[in-house]
């Protein structure tokens, strides 16, 4: 019985949409291959098979981890002592998205990614007594009338009983605007050296943008792409694996284009 239960994570993954769907496609391609006898008719099957295999790989957490280590510059974690030693003046949290239809809160709340960033910033702020800034408006895909992310973050801090934001930048729509508008806000108060909080995979491009805006930046990364799954599960497709490879590829392209 225990042996069967130990297979539960694998069996569950196999029937989930990402893995189960790709296995079904592979099965149909094998069937089509055996039904087809002409070479020219098999070429589309070969192409579809290669594409499906690549999608399988890009949906694996093992591949996401490998890509994050080889495509993106690596950033090391920091602690409170590091920020004090480097004379950081403020902690800046990069927005990570809002869930506008959070019915359990009767209004908007931070996305899980944004909340993770905010929680880490709270930890650093409490350890260093440094003031916090949050940067995030209504993204390009947002709609008029929505609450800005910085305002939602301020509400979240109140719910958590955490220190209030010293600065709210609520007009930016992307990382470039995050940097430009936050830099203007902080410089008016004499702040030039910040600890920047965002996910590790998002950090290299973010640091580049904030330094271009004239701030001295100490990266304070969190949310590294890692996995505590067994090696077998890391090589089975999952929605999380596909999402993580998407993050890495997007950031890699962003670094190439900026």
What are these regions (language model features)?
Residues 25-30, 44, 51-52:
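Small-residue hotspots
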Residues 46-61:
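Hydrophobic membrane-insertion alpha-helices, especially the h-region
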């Amino acid at each position: 019985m225990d042996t069967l239960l130990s297979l539960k994570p694998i069996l569950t993954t196999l029937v989930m949409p990402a893995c189960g769907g790709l296995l079904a496609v592979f099965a149909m391609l094998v069937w089509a291959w055996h039904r087809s006898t002409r070479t020219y008719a098999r070429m589309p099957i070969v192409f579809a098979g290669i594409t499906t295999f690549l999608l399988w790989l890009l949906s694996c957490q093992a591949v996401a981890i490998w890509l994050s280590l080889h495509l993106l510059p690596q950033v090391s974690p920091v602690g409170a002592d590091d920020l004090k030693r480097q004379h950081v003046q403020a902690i800046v949290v990069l927005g990570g998205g809002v869930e506008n239809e959070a019915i359990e809160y009767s209004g908007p709340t931070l996305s899980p990614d944004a909340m993770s960033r905010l929680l880490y910033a709270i930890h650093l702020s409490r350890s260093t007594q440094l003031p916090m800034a949050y940067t995030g408006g209504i993204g390009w895909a947002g709609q008029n009338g929505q609450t800005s992310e910085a305002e939602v973050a301020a509400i979240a801090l109140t719910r958590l009983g955490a220190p209030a934001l010293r600065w709210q930048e609520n007009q930016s729509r992307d990382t470039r605007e995050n940097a430009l508008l936050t830099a203007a806000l902080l410089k008016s108060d004499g702040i030039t050296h910040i600890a920047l909080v965002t996910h590790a995979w998002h950090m290299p491009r973010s640091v580049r943008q904030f330094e271009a805006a004239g701030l001295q930046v100490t990266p304070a990364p969190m949310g590294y792409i890692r996995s505590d799954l067994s090696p077998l599960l890391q090589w089975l497709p999952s929605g999380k694996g596909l999402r993580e490879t998407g993050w890495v590829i997007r950031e890699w392209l962003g670094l190439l284009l900026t």
